[in-house]
């Protein structure tokens, strides 16, 4: 790591701490040449490969937005959705891949949403899994009943 002040490559890590969300690491560093201290925040990037082949950085806000519609009229708070998005991101990062398909995001959302609200789960699953008949809904409800 280069010193922000004198541009020397000779720096030493004094302290490292994981952020509260567990996604980034804050490091306190000291330049061995000028002795000044500075902090860095390090995160591993997570890229989403969309269905059309384009890529974009993972954003929790998109998870919240996608799940919000399924939760309308349900007893689900914004804080609940924020926690769900954090868990989804943690699950995706735990896979060890720096790139994930948009399909993987949907698969990571389903169990978290099921834990949060069964009706919202059915709503989200009906769109995500492209339900096109009453039988699709019935099978999904039966699976929930049998759990």
UniProtKB/Swiss-Prot annotation:
Cofactor binding note from Swiss-Prot or TrEMBL: Binds 1 zinc ion.
Annotated ranges, domain ATP-cone: 46-136
Keyword Transcription regulation recorded: yes
Pfam families listed in its UniProt record: ATP-cone, Zn_ribbon_NrdR
Transmembrane helix keyword on record: no
Cofactor or coenzyme needed: Zn(2+)
Annotated GO biological process: negative regulation of DNA-templated transcription
GO MF term set: ATP binding; DNA binding; zinc ion binding
Zinc fingers, unnamed class: 3-34
UniProt keywords, alphabetically: ATP-binding, DNA-binding, Metal-binding, Nucleotide-binding, Repressor, Transcription, Transcription regulation, Zinc, Zinc-finger
Function: Negatively regulates transcription of bacterial ribonucleotide reductase nrd genes and operons by binding to NrdR-boxes.
Family: Belongs to the NrdR family.
Protein name in UniProt: Transcriptional repressor NrdR
């Amino acid at each position: 790591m280069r010193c922000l002040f004198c541009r020397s490559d000779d720096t030493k890590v004094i302290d490292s701490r994981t952020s509260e969300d567990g996604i980034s690491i804050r490091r306190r560093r000291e330049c061995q040449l000028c002795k000044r201290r500075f902090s860095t925040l390090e995160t591993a990037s997570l890229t989403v490969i969309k269905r059309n082949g384009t890529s974009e950085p993972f954003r929790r806000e998109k998870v919240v937005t996608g799940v919000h519609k399924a939760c309308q009229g349900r007893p689900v708070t914004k804080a609940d959705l924020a926690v769900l998005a954090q868990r989804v991101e943690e699950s995706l990062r735990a896979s060890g891949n720096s790139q994930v398909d948009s399909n993987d995001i949907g698969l990571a959302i389903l169990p978290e949403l099921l834990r949060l609200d069964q009706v919202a789960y059915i709503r989200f699953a009906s769109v995500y899994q492209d339900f096109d008949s009453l039988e699709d809904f019935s099978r999904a409800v039966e699976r929930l009943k049998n759990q």
